[in-house]
Amino acid sequence: SLLLSYQTILAHYIHGKPSSWKSLEKPKFICPVPGFDRHFRIFDDFDIEVITVPLIEDGVDLAKLKNVLDENQNVMGIICVPRHSNPSGEVYTDENINGIFSIGKAYSDKFLFLFDHAYLIHDFLPTKKQTPTWQLALNNDTNNQTVIVTSFSKVTFGGGGLSFLAADGDNLDLIKKTRLSMVICPDKINQQRHVDLFKNKEAIESHMTKHANLIRPKFETSYEILGSISDDYGTFSKPTGGYFITYKTSKPIASKVIELCSMLGVSLTPAGATFPNSNDPNNNIIRIAPTFIDEDELKIAMDVFITSVQVAHLGPVSYTHLTLPTNVAV
């Protein structure tokens, strides 16, 4: 889905109608934050300015989105992860997606709505229902402005799954035009492998249930350990699917926490990575990936993390008030 997202932006940059984006003065694109670092890199490659809008519980902050569009010219579109958003896990409501469509459409009938549905079927706990995004696009008469991408990269093998794209009108024509110059044909053997394994919807759902059973305990362990220290130190997201947790420190100490963890042998996503140019303006967002290691290692890593949060929060003072796990010493 990342490659299809890139090719969608490339298509508009080179062949966009009525004007290619490369011919415009200071084109811009909106990214909700905290967000996916690879999305930011796409726009860096094309020297497209990224404008951020905050995420709230139900999706994008619509008031901030409208303000951004009211104050800026040549905003070409918005990219969203509408289900289990990376890294904080928001699941957009239908009302929020409808609002995004309404505000963007009012700004321009060429405004691009790019949805990266990387975690479309990746629930591991009960998750709110969503109307299919393409149906919402049809309902809002924005199907000619909408591109939805997803893949099986996190279903079968990373980088080795099948990818899918939904688009219409000029968007579909532009993407096809660009891809036809790049790709002779898809990997048909890989397609056949997937068809042989996933013969129907039920087979896919059964497979994802197995994924959920592997992943859920790791998240529950993480929630328990993160919840063992006071909210005075920070708060954390509790996603019902996807692959990440976001920890928000109450002080601007994210970089210090990550440094302390690294000193103790725990590697985390670099500070600032969930913002454009790796610049977290408040230095307080940390992305946690519980799925990477086994559960025993995860418990140790999370103990290191909460200890590092407390040490960084308290600074050079006595640590008598720390909530310390038994296997971590300061």
Name these PLM-found stretches.
Residues 1-109, 121-141, 252-254, 306, ...:
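Conserved core of the PLP fold type I
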Residues 77, 112, 147:
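Hydrophobic "anchor" residues on beta-strands that sit immediately upstream
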Residues 320-326:
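Conserved small/polar residues in nucleotide/adenosyl-binding loops
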Residues 246-251, 268-302, 308:
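Conserved PLP-binding active-site segment of the aspartate aminotransferase-like
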Residues 137-216:
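Conserved core segment of the aminotransferase class I/II
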Residues 209-223, 233-248:
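Conserved glycine-rich beta-strand-loop-beta hairpin in the small C-terminal domain of fold type I
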Residues 117-118:
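Conserved Walker B
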